Amino acid sequence: MAVDVKSRAKRYEKLDFLGEGQFATVYKARDKNTNQIVAIKKIKLGHRSEAKDGINRTALREIKLLQELSHPNIIGLLDAFGHKSNISLVFDFMETDLEVIIKDNSLVLTPSHIKAYMLMTLQGLEYLHQHWILHRDLKPNNLLLDENGVLKLADFGLAKSFGSPNRAYTHQVVTRWYRAPELLFGARMYGVGVDMWAVGCILAELLLRVPFLPGDSDLDQLTRIFETLGTPTEEQWPDMCSLPDYVTFKSFPGVPLQHIFIAAGDDLLELIQGLFLFNPCTRTTASQALKTKYFSNRPGPTPGCQLPRPNCPVEALKEPANPTVATKRKRAEALEQGILPKKLIF
């Protein structure tokens, strides 16, 4: 067995360093057997309290879920093996991510481009939800793009099966800027709505080319949501007041969506409105979103091979042109590391 693991580790030739997080390092590599270019996520084993059978629980969850999933818009897990004090996950190599595309100001994102990105995101998410899995960490840099322009959902370290009656979950999931209001109010029982709210934030970011609701804290995040979308009433969200961390907010009227997304047509505004419904029980699902007029109306989505590719080095695009946004993003991610391990793409 030890020989087999060692031979599997030697099967991959490291080509380049791609990134590093608190618990993992990512490399570009070549599979010597097939000549395929892959990405290897090498995870450092957690402390005893964080590990199960010597494997970090987050990694174990990611392996288990990805082994059961197969969809064109979900990252493929090609191999997984332990070696020395690490566990390595081998993935499809992806050229870039949606965050890089959004930040590259040399690229023009047309309505057809945005529709293509949203179509692939929702198709992958619909598959997940049909298989009773919540992603729980959707954001632009977890939506990866390969050399053919195919978008794939990635980073399943926080993903979770759902559907068991009365099963409680942690509310400290999803990066704050993409976190649904029910999570910010401390909901322990939730469903697909948390992913759909994040999709709404990603769609808004594609349209605006900046993060839509970049809050500094959970309280600030809720304030930004209500100032922008209006403070919900009990009629709009019946169970709001019973949530564990609910606090009363000033009644904000909100800004009409057409004043925020000035170039959006009625069909797109209707989709955005459905994704940002406060009541998670009535919030648009992935299947419902795919059936909206937005996707059946013209223009059609751009084919993957014709989607824009970044013109600038990825490293430069990871530092936004707007230093305020860059600082806030780093601060938000740093604060959340006190609760959650730092997330990495692969």
Swiss-Prot record:
UniProt-annotated binding residues for ATP: 18-26, 41
Localization terms from the record: Nucleus; Cytoplasm; Cytoplasm, Perinuclear region
PTM sites of type Phosphoserine: 7, 164
Ways its activity is controlled: Phosphorylation at Thr-170 is required for enzymatic activity. The association of p53/TP53 to the CAK complex in response to DNA damage reduces kinase activity toward CDK2 and RNA polymerase II repetitive C-terminal domain (CTD), thus stopping cell cycle progression.
Catalyzed reactions: L-seryl-[protein] + ATP = O-phospho-L-seryl-[protein] + ADP + H(+); L-threonyl-[protein] + ATP = O-phospho-L-threonyl-[protein] + ADP + H(+); [DNA-directed RNA polymerase] + ATP = phospho-[DNA-directed RNA polymerase] + ADP + H(+)
Modified residues (N-acetylalanine): 2
Catalytic residue list: 137
Chain positions with Phosphothreonine modification: 170
Ranges of residues in domain Protein kinase: 12-295
Gene Ontology molecular-function annotations: ATP binding; ATP-dependent activity, acting on DNA; cyclin-dependent protein serine/threonine kinase activity; kinase activity; protein kinase activity; protein serine kinase activity; RNA polymerase II CTD heptapeptide repeat kinase activity; RNA polymerase II CTD heptapeptide repeat S5 kinase activity
PTM annotation: Phosphorylation of Ser-164 during mitosis inactivates the enzyme. Phosphorylation of Thr-170 is required for activity. Phosphorylated at Ser-164 and Thr-170 by CDK2.
Domain of life: Eukaryota
Gene Ontology, cellular component aspect: CAK-ERCC2 complex; cyclin-dependent protein kinase holoenzyme complex; cytosol; fibrillar center; male germ cell nucleus; nucleus; perinuclear region of cytoplasm; plasma membrane
Family statement: Belongs to the protein kinase superfamily. CMGC Ser/Thr protein kinase family. CDC2/CDKX subfamily.
Quaternary structure and partners: Associates primarily with cyclin-H (CCNH) and MAT1 to form the CAK complex. CAK can further associate with the core-TFIIH to form the TFIIH basal transcription factor; this complex is sensitive to UV light. The CAK complex binds to p53/TP53 in response to DNA damage. Interacts with CDK2, SF1/NR5A1, PUF60 and PRKCI. Interacts with HINT1.
Function recorded in the entry: Serine/threonine kinase involved in cell cycle control and in RNA polymerase II-mediated RNA transcription. Cyclin-dependent kinases (CDKs) are activated by the binding to a cyclin and mediate the progression through the cell cycle. Each different complex controls a specific transition between 2 subsequent phases in the cell cycle. Required for both activation and complex formation of CDK1/cyclin-B during G2-M transition, and for activation of CDK2/cyclins during G1-S transition (but not complex formation). CDK7 is the catalytic subunit of the CDK-activating kinase (CAK) complex.
Name listed for the protein in its UniProt record: Cyclin-dependent kinase 7
Organism: Mus musculus
Gene name tied to this protein: Cdk7
